[in-house]
Each structure stands twice: as C-alpha cells, then as structure tokens.
Amino acid sequence: MVLETISKIIKTQLPAYLKKFPLPETIGGFARLTVLDWLRLLPLLGILTLLGYLTIRPFLPKKKKQKDSLINLKIQKENPKVVNEIDIEDLKSTNVCYCRCWRSKTFPVCDKSHIKHNELTGDNVGPLILKKKII
C-alpha cells in the first residue's frame, strides 16, 4: 500500500508537476515570474532549502551546554549552606527534607542533589527540613 502510493507519486504526479514547473532559463527570468508561478515554485524551494540545511548542519558550531546558574543570589551568603529547620506539631513522620535546588530526581523530596550543584556553581543552597515538634 505504501510502496504503491510512493510509486504513483514518483511515476505520475511528479512528472506532471515538473511539466507545469515555471523554471526560467535565465536569472532575469525570475523577475518576470507571476505570483502564481512563485507559488508553484514554493514546494521545490522549500525542499531544496531543507536539503541544504541538512547538508550543512553537521558543520555548524554546536551550542555550548549552559553552565548551571546560582539559585540563591542573596540569602545568607555568609553561610556555607543555607538549611532551614521548621518544627511542626501535626507532622506525621519525624523528619521530611524538601528540595530547594530544583535538581532532585525525587522532587519535591530532597535527594542531596544540592551538594553536587553547590560544588559546580559555588552556590550555598540546602534543603528545607520539617521536623515533628515534640511537645
């Protein structure tokens, strides 16, 4: 089914398209093309542009991976790591650590990804620790 469709396009529709194709013989002939002629040229120009891009793409400069940026810009910068502990009476478990660096694979729970982030960037972000308040 697919091969029959491709065969029909190549054997029937493509030759019919190329017969009606308004390709001028000189460069100055492009200036004399009508709007309808330009519209007929658009699919071919699009395909040629795509093929040209795909050809030169391996030679284009690669984008550099952006360096991890700081998260904590001004809070307690004098401390090596900012960790806040909050006592809550109604907490079901004894301790819960929440991520504030947005790098945790178990987000929102902290998996200590901030340690690697802090080493790479020089940041001082740490987790938010919720403790069960002992009455």
UniProtKB/Swiss-Prot annotation:
This protein's name: CDGSH iron-sulfur domain-containing protein 2B
SMART domains, per database record: ZnF_CDGSH (SM00704)
Spans within the Lumenal topological domain: 1-37
Alphabetically ordered keywords of this record: 2Fe-2S, Autophagy, Endoplasmic reticulum, Iron, Iron-sulfur, Membrane, Metal-binding, Mitochondrion, Mitochondrion outer membrane, Transmembrane, Transmembrane helix
Membrane spanning residue stretches: 38-60
Family: Belongs to the CISD protein family. CISD2 subfamily.
Gene for this chain: cisd2b
Subcellular location, record wording: Endoplasmic reticulum membrane; Mitochondrion outer membrane
Cytoplasmic compartment residues: 61-135
Its membrane topology: Single-pass membrane protein
GO cellular component terms attached to this protein's record: endoplasmic reticulum membrane; mitochondrial outer membrane
Description of how the protein assembles with itself and partners: Homodimer.
An example Gene Ontology molecular-function term: protein homodimerization activity
Species the sequence originates in: Oncorhynchus mykiss (Rainbow trout)
Gene3D superfamilies reported for this sequence: CDGSH iron-sulfur domain, mitoNEET-type (3.40.5.90)
Pfam families: MitoNEET_N, zf-CDGSH
